[in-house]
Swiss-Prot record:
Gene3D superfamilies: Periplasmic binding protein-like II, Porphobilinogen deaminase, C-terminal domain. Its EC number is 2.5.1.61. Pathway: Porphyrin-containing compound metabolism; protoporphyrin-IX biosynthesis; coproporphyrinogen-III from 5-aminolevulinate: step 2/4. The porphobilinogen subunits are added to the dipyrromethane group. Tetrapolymerization of the monopyrrole PBG into the hydroxymethylbilane pre-uroporphyrinogen in several discrete steps. It holds the Pfam family Porphobil_deamC. This is Probable porphobilinogen deaminase. It comes from the Archaea. NCBIfam families: hemC. One of its GO terms (molecular function) is hydroxymethylbilane synthase activity. Keywords: Porphyrin biosynthesis, Transferase. Belongs to the HMBS family. It comes from Methanosarcina mazei (strain ATCC BAA-159 / DSM 3647 / Goe1 / Go1 / JCM 11833 / OCM 88). The modification S-(dipyrrolylmethanemethyl)cysteine is found at residue 234.
Length: 316
């Protein structure tokens, strides 16, 4: 079976892990690299590439529907909420660390960085969250693979860089930094999770289904439902995070929408029952809208369309 993937270091690491897991199940695979629009246009923010929605996903869907690949591996947070019915998410792998990490040259934490320090990030959400806590900090766009980002930090182009901790883990790199609690920096929906998709009704679907991790599937679905009605995807400062409690009776859910400048935030932080959690998450999503979440998201989209913060989007 042929697995399609982006060609970045991180995407290849994720795909090689899936190939290894399938081999353990007796399934032989080969890997085919697909160049996506998100990879081709690294000189511009993601929201300027195909509208920012599915910039790393759409081309893989196309080659799968054309029968050129059997399986595709994605960072789940890159995947649009609305997906082709013919390409189901067959497996959600066990989640890696879902939180953000700040790397600075000398290990200085966010609250001790000097005024006017420059932090590189590719995420509107992280930018808004930084501004909420440290409005004196300057945020600048930072795209490229993880090696490139670390090199720019070492060269002094930034005083710090913020990215997903999971990316470092998947590369096998142990780098010390400040890891942020979801109570402080609510992560992007599905951050730290890898999804595996196939065409419906194929041998690949049956094989990949053996890799599905039930708990990770539950919480990632909850996270998507919480923010589904807000719209905007990676082009709005939105976070959501769900985790099953140790007693396995409830799910702790957090979701927030921020203004681009971080001065306004609407947040939900509640426990919902594990059984029936999907419906309860929908109710909380409606409440987030009623509290003004959609208004904030729409205002952010309008500002972006006018050029405000055009340097930032999502990504790792």
């Amino acid at each position: 079976m042929i697995i399609g993937t982006r060609g970045s270091q991180l995407a290849l690491a994720q795909t090689e892990n899936v190939a290894r897991l399938l081999k353990e199940k007796g399934v032989e695979t080969s890997i085919k690299i697909i160049k996506t629009s998100g990879d081709r246009f690294t000189d511009r923010p993601l929201h300027a590439v195909s509208g920012g929605v599915g910039a790393f996903v759409r081309e893989l869907d196309d080659v799968m529907l054309a029968g050129e690949i059997d399986i595709a591996v994605h960072s789940m947070k890159d995947m649009p909420t609305i997906r082709p019915k013919a390409i189901p998410t067959v497996a959600v792998l066990k989640r890696d660390t879902p939180f953000d990490i700040l790397l600075t040259y000398d290990g200085t934490p966010l609250d001790e960085l000097p005024e006017q320090s420059i932090i590189g990030t590719s995420s509107l959400r992280r930018t808004a969250q930084i501004r909420r806590y440290r409005p004196d900090i300057i945020t600048q766009n930072l795209r490229g693979n993880i090696d490139t980002r670390l090199r720019k930090l070492r060269e002094g182009q930034y005083d710090g860089i913020m990215l997903a901790k999971a990316g470092l883990e998947r590369m096998g790199w142990e780098i010390e930094g400040e890891i942020f609690s979801p109570d402080f920096f609510c992560p992007s929906p599905n951050q730290g999770t890898v999804a595996v998709v196939t065409r419906e009704g194929t041998e690949a679907e049956a094989a990949v289904s053996m890799l599905d991790h039930t708990e990770s599937r539950i919480v990632t679905e909850i996270e998507r439902i919480l923010i589904a009605e807000l719209g905007g995807g990676c082009t709005t400062p939105v976070g959501s995070y769900a985790e099953i409690t140790p007693d396995r009776q409830e799910i702790h859910v957090r979701a927030e929408v921020l203004s681009l400048d971080g001065r306004e935030a609407i947040r939900i932080d509640e426990f919902i029952p594990l059984r029936g959690g999907i419906e309860k998450a929908r109710e909380l999503g409606h409440r987030l809208v009623e509290m003004g979440g959609r208004r904030l998201a729409e205002e952010a989209l309008l500002q972006i369309s006018r050029g405000a913060d055009s340097e930032n989007s999502c990504d790792y």
